[in-house]
Every structure is written in structure tokens, then in C-alpha cells.
Amino acid sequence: MKVVLLKDIPGIGKTGDMKEVKDGYARNFLIPRGLAKMATEGEIKRIRNEKILKEHKEDLTKKKSEEILKTLQKQIHKVPAKVGGGGKLFGALTSTNLSEILSKNSGVEIDKKWINMDKPLKETGLYDIEMRLPGGVRGTIKVEIVGEEKG
């Protein structure tokens, strides 16, 4: 029996795939649990349309992410911070702080999840920060922590 999968099923296929399975498996397991539907003409057309829309949406997300990354890579982002002796910061620069600063400077909303930092930055200097944006877009931006001497 041909079925269209409504959810990812290990060993069988992914959502939207059309698969040939045994009649009993489809009638007694997949269909009653809402994991698959019988592959009728209408269902096949609906799945194709959903796949096209999903691919189009993913393309738009990727293009938007690439534009955001290009905007961020155009400059070195200076981050003022209060420092003590030896260039050590009072506190630390985290991905949350950095996302707020980048959002303010670039005019584009930057999610803290896009910033890949192993640990918070605690010293002044120039850093390469890895960005992981939606759509599989990756790149690095330059961030310079500039000290404001406490007087």
C-alpha cells in the first residue's frame, strides 16, 4: 500500500515522503497513530505543494541570513566596556550582551542563539566571533572590546 508520511519515521522515511509499505502495517499501525495517510491523488498534490512552499521559505531564510551576515562583516564592532588593571573587564561580554549591541549597531535584530561563543569574553582586544544563522549560514565577524578606564 502506498502511504504519505506525516511524520519522520526512523527506518522508513521523512515527513512528506511517499512510501510503499505492507497493508497491515499501514492499516494497523501508521494510519491509526497519525503517522501516515493513504496516498490518494489529492494527498499527493497537497504534499507536493507543501514541499514547494517549504523549499521557497528555506531559500528566503537563507538569503536573508546571508544579507545579515554581510552587513555584520562589513565592519569591526567596537564594544565599550569598563576595565581594571591589565585590560581585564569588570564583568564579561556574553552572547546576550553582544546580540543586544549588534542589534543596536546594525539595525537588524540579532538572536543570541546565532552567536557561537565558547565562553564569555573577559579581556579587551580584537576577537573573531563565529555566527550560525538560520538556513545553515555560517561566518565570522570581528568584535573589538575597547576599555574605558575607570577613574
From Swiss-Prot:
The keyword rRNA-binding applies. Keywords: Ribonucleoprotein, Ribosomal protein, RNA-binding, rRNA-binding. It holds the Pfam family Ribosomal_L9_C. GO terms for molecular function: rRNA binding; structural constituent of ribosome. One of its GO terms (cellular component) is ribosome. GO terms for biological process: translation. SUPFAM superfamilies: L9 N-domain-like, Ribosomal protein L9 C-domain. Binds to the 23S rRNA. Belongs to the bacterial ribosomal protein bL9 family. This is Large ribosomal subunit protein bL9. It comes from Pseudothermotoga lettingae (strain ATCC BAA-301 / DSM 14385 / NBRC 107922 / TMO).
